[in-house]
């Protein structure tokens, strides 16, 4: 998650200069500060929290991925104007994919989540990312509204990623447990 200042806010006629802008704040990338796991409809009681990959899949086995971040501390008066989720897709079969991100509204733990106990999530899609899964590439999604809500009401239950149609194919993303060595 990365926060950046809003250009329209900076260009408002009422803005007094010099403007003090705090640096961009980024969440920790340490595996201990990120909870992530994927779930499978086919293996509905299995847990995949300690896997190097997060999967999204459609067809006869639906897979969805869940992520939750320890948010950086911000001061009173700080304003969140932009928050992005940036992940790495490991490529697949060259098919065009569309990933949807949803806000999770029920508590969950990465070590115990499975298909049968998956948390409730908002049906409203926060953002979509369309890309061709043909090589390693960054997948970037706007999660500004969700992050603002997490800070405002303390309801950080994370997010869920899924393929938009869940009809066929799969997407493989790096998890926080990816071994970069």
Stretches found by the model and what they are:
Residues 3-5, 9, 67-72, 141-144:
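Short edge beta-strand/strand-turn motifs with a hydrophobic/aromatic core
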